[in-house]
Structures are given as structure tokens and as C-alpha cells.
Design a protein with these regions (language model features):
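Basic, Lys/Arg-enriched alpha-helical interface segments
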Residues: 1-67
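Basic/aromatic recognition patch in beta-strand/loop cores that engages polyanionic ligands
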Residues: 54-86
Length: 86
């Protein structure tokens, strides 16, 4: 029996950052912005199935707080796991 996927919840600040990044890229290259948004979405979906996928940061304070991160192109996506929510 498989475990259900974890829920992925973006903080409001993360949503704002994501929108700003996609808008910035779209100003010069709309198709690249769409590809970036799709790549981030696919990585978040993968993370919901495999929450240990991300790397452990080198900064010990972040490690103590339970942070991990994904590298998506030139961007870092930091996350924590709280119960069944990322």
C-alpha cells in the first residue's frame, strides 16, 4: 500500500517571488518563462512524492531548522517538512 503524496504549500512570500521571477523572465523571453514555471511546478510535484529529494544546506542554522532545498536552473527552492506538508 503506497503512502499518499505530501501536500505542498507555498508561503505567500514564495508565491510572490515566483511570480516576480516568471514576470522578469517573460519580459524578454515569454516561452522561457513558461518553461521555467512548468519546470518549477514539475519539481514541486516530484517533491510531494519524494520529500527527501532536496539537498541538505551547508548552513548549520538551516539544517537545525530542518530546511532542505532544490536547485531549479539558477534558483534555489528552500522547504521544510512539517507532518504531511511541505
Amino acid at each position: 500500500m503506497s503512502r499518499p503524496d505530501y501536500a505542498v504549500r507555498l508561503l505567500r512570500l514564495a508565491e510572490e517571488d515566483l511570480n516576480e521571477i516568471v514576470s522578469y523572465v517573460a519580459a524578454d523571453r515569454p516561452s522561457a518563462a513558461e518553461e521555467l514555471a512548468d519546470r518549477i511546478e514539475k519539481n514541486l510535484q516530484l517533491l510531494s512524492r519524494i520529500p527527501g529529494l532536496g539537498r541538505v544546506p551547508a548552513e548549520q542554522q538551516l539544517v537545525r531548522l530542518g530546511y532542505r532545498y532544490l536547485v531549479i536552473e539558477n534558483y534555489l527552492v528552500f522547504y521544510t517538512l512539517e507532518g504531511a506538508t511541505i
